[in-house]
UniProtKB/Swiss-Prot annotation:
Gene3D superfamilies attached to this UniProt entry: 3.40.50.11700, Winged helix-like DNA-binding domain superfamily/Winged helix DNA-binding domain
Top-level taxon: Archaea
Identification of the protein by name: CRISPR locus-related putative DNA-binding protein Csa3
Cited SUPFAM superfamilies: Winged helix' DNA-binding domain (SSF46785)
Family as reported in the entry's similarity comment: Belongs to the CRISPR-associated Csa3 family.
Molecular function GO terms recorded: DNA binding
Source organism (scientific name): Methanocaldococcus jannaschii (strain ATCC 43067 / DSM 2661 / JAL-1 / JCM 10045 / NBRC 100440)
DNA-binding found in the keyword field: yes
Keyword ATP-binding tagged: no
GO biological process: defense response to virus
Length: 208
């Protein structure tokens, strides 16, 4: 299997959001990961226990990634330099990147999420891992998003009907299949819908 995805994760005092109880990487098959970037932060007044805890977490991550033969980079940031962090995080988001926002300081996760929104064309998914191990995926919707009248009609129809095929949407809205296909693709680029394959049919569903 070809390794082709970058995995970016924030972390703090533990790794149970990155590795499951069997030591497998959460959110993706480890054989698909080309490299990993692990982001953490330390306050300038961090005490010895905090520093040692972060060090132990780094050591464990390092040992697991060496075991899987996955190249990695640790990045320490100042958590409160938000704009600088966003700018730098954007550089790490290459095509086919997945992002795990669960660990570490919340403000660092916010900066990484904001960077992901700005680089959404390169992002496969952004997610959070709950205490029970459930993966919660975040939609990447820019705050200044604008919708056309037909896009709104498509979204309203999906609200009422749930999942629908592209041809069914076209029939309901009395528009050509090519027109609806074009507008559904625009909504997908904006992060508002997903297209799923069910046999030969393309099914459309809202992200949120």
């Amino acid at each position: 299997m070809v390794r082709y995805m970058r995995y970016i994760a924030t972390f703090g005092y533990h790794t149970n959001h990155i590795f499951d109880k069997n030591g497998k990487i959460i959110g993706i098959d480890d054989e698909k990961i080309s490299n990993m970037i692990l982001i953490y932060s330390l306050d300038v007044d961090a005490d010895e226990n905090t520093v040692n805890s972060i060090k132990n977490t780094k050591n464990y991550i390092e040992s697991k990634l060496k075991e899987y033969n996955i190249p990695y980079l640790f990045v320490e940031v100042n958590p409160y330099e938000f704009n600088t962090n966003v700018k730098n995080f954007r550089k790490y988001i290459v095509p086919k990147t997945i992002i795990n926002l669960t660990g570490g300081k919340r403000i660092v996760g916010y900066a990484l999420f904001y960077a992901a929104v700005l680089e959404k064309e390169n992002v496969e998914k952004v997610f959070y891992v709950s205490k029970l191990g459930d993966i919660i995926e975040f939609p990447l919707i820019p705050p200044d998003i604008k919708l056309t009248e037909l896009e709104m009609k498509i979204l309203n129809l999906l609200d009422k009907e749930g999942e629908m095929s592209v041809s069914n949407i076209a029939h309901k809205l009395e528009r050509s299949l090519s027109t609806i296909s074009e507008y559904v693709s625009q909504l997908e680029k904006k992060g508002l819908v997903k297209k799923l394959s069910k046999g030969r049919r393309k099914i459309v569903k809202k992200v949120i």
